[in-house]
Swiss-Prot record:
An annotated Gene Ontology molecular function: 3-deoxy-7-phosphoheptulonate synthase activity
Family: Belongs to the class-II DAHP synthase family.
Pathway involvement of the protein, from the record: Metabolic intermediate biosynthesis; chorismate biosynthesis; chorismate from D-erythrose 4-phosphate and phosphoenolpyruvate: step 1/7
Enzyme Commission number: 2.5.1.54
Assembly and binders: Homodimer.
Gene Ontology biological process terms from the UniProt entry: amino acid biosynthetic process; aromatic amino acid family biosynthetic process; chorismate biosynthetic process
Protein name, entry field: Phospho-2-dehydro-3-deoxyheptonate aldolase
Length: 450
């Protein structure tokens, strides 16, 4: 595996000539330039060879030979870079992955919204409270959450804090996933505890018992594969702040190709996917696996143009369409996209994001999501693919390993009146640990019905 040491002066900077949506307006451009220069000198957070490995795994997803589980915080926070937070999030994803692997009988590619998800696009540039108007909070990588003038000024030094927070997180994730913490038998024991304590546990008991029997059978045969003790885990985030992403773009010394070494996979969001704008241009220059969020306004023509721009060689594993339609629209909007893309001969991975199209404001003023809506969008996604004979490639979920109260519903039900108890998100509502595991068991049932 190669350390991407060399940086081309113009590496990944062609986007600078194009309009770039959702970029912060820094008051001190000299300070920004100094930060970019520092970032360009920093070591890579991931290696090109690892990005290629994920491309190969995503190719299997696109061909129907694997399933993607992508999840993590809506927006990471600097003050949440702690062993407990990271471990709980990873534990939840590993538990979900174990259930899905057994039920689907295909490898589950595990990718975190982690170690870089510190920025958020916003619908409005400013926020007004009690007659005071300040810049919107855009994530810890841009400005502070506190509603004060000082906190809300975009500060380029935060880009360096994002790099260091991401490095700390990745270091711990690598230790957990290779040091025995991710052992499959341990993960299964956690799932058994969940099944026992969950109000929905009875529904999941059969599947948990089957997994138990399979593990007991292997143990009786004297089988103890090394794969049981470690897990492959990749990082991903939205490539939103182009100054940061391009500063961490390197030339791979093996191939001469450009890689964004801030994460294994990056995606372009619904608000920044304009074909003739900077984000798509940046994504077209790097070799990482790329995701594109597709909302309900996406046309089949646009989807085909993304393929032309981002995957001209038609390489499975390069491009992932992350569909975020809303539970009430997925069954109407998705079929044409899948049909036209499939007819074009392109092999892309189709993933459902059942979170972003299902947000509403509760009477209390909290942004929330109904677990039943999230589940219904996933159901619609599976139904569409089943009817077309195509592969439902995976799920992309905003979740936490903590017992927060941000989304309503679930087996261990959260009510609207409970939202205030532990509403901790910096931006959008996340599924808590129990709701995430509920979702995994229910998606496992759907996959079996395919």
């Amino acid at each position: 595996m190669t350390v991407n040491a060399k940086t081309s002066p113009s590496a990944g900077n062609t986007w600078r000539d194009l309009p770039a949506a959702q970029q912060p307006e820094y008051p001190d451009t000299e300070a920004l330039r100094a930060v970019i220069a520092d970032l360009e000198s920093y070591p890579p957070l991931v290696f090109a060879g690892e990005c290629d490995q994920l491309r190969a795994r995503m190719a299997a997803v696109a061909k129907g030979e694997a399933f993607l589980l992508q999840g993590g915080d809506c927006a990471e926070a600097f003050d949440a870079v702690s062993a407990d937070h990271i471990r709980n999030k990873l534990k939840t994803l590993l538990q979900m992955g174990a259930v899905l692997t057994y039920a689907a009988s295909v490898p589950v590619v595990k990718v975190g919204r982690i170690a870089g998800q510190y920025s958020k696009p916003r619908s409005k540039p400013t926020e007004t409270r009690d007659g005071v108007t300040l810049p919107t909070y855009r994530g810890d990588s841009v400005n502070g959450f506190d509603f004060t003038e000082a906190a809300r000024i975009p500060d380029p030094e935060r880009l360096k804090r994002m790099y260091h927070a991401s490095a700390s997180t990745l270091n711990l994730v690598r230790a957990f996933t290779t040091g025995g913490y991710a052992d499959l038998r341990q993960v299964h024991a956690w799932n058994q505890d969940f099944v026992k304590s969950s109000p929905s546990g009875q529904r999941y008991e059969q599947l948990a018992r089957e997994i138990d029997n399979a593990l007991n059978f292997m143990r009786a045969c004297g089988t103890d594969p090394a794969e049981f003790q470690t897990v492959e885990f990749f990082s991903s985030h939205e490539a939103l702040l182009l100054d940061y992403e391009s500063a961490l773009t390197r030339v791979d010394s093996r191939t001469g190709q450009l890689y964004d070494v801030s994460g294994h996979m990056v995606w372009i969001g619904e608000r920044t996917r304009q074909l003739d704008h900077a984000h798509i241009e940046f994504a077209s220059r790097i070799r990482n696996p790329i995701g594109i969020k597709l909302g309900p306004s996406t046309t089949a023509e646009e989807a085909l143009q993304y393929i032309e721009r981002l995957d001209p060689e038609r390489e499975p594993g390069r491009l992932t369409f992350i569909v975020r339609m809303g539970a009430d629209k997925i069954r109407d909007k998705l079929p044409e996209l899948v049909e036209k893309v499939t007819a074009s001969g392109a092999t892309v991975a189709w993933i459902t994001d059942p979170m972003h199209g299902n947000t509403y404001e509760a009477a209390s003023g909290h942004k929330t999501r109904r677990f039943d809506d999230v589940l219904d969008e996933v159901k619609g996604f599976f139904e569409v693919h089943k009817s077309l004979g195509t592969h439902p490639g995976g799920i992309h979920v905003e979740l936490t390993g903590d017992d927060v109260t941000e989304c309503v519903g679930g087996g261990d039900e959260i009510f609207v009146d409970d939202l205030h108890q532990r509403y901790e998100t910096a931006c959008d509502p996340r599924l808590n640990r129990s709701q995430s595991l509920d979702l995994a068991f229910l998606v496992a049932e759907m996959y079996r019905d395919q």
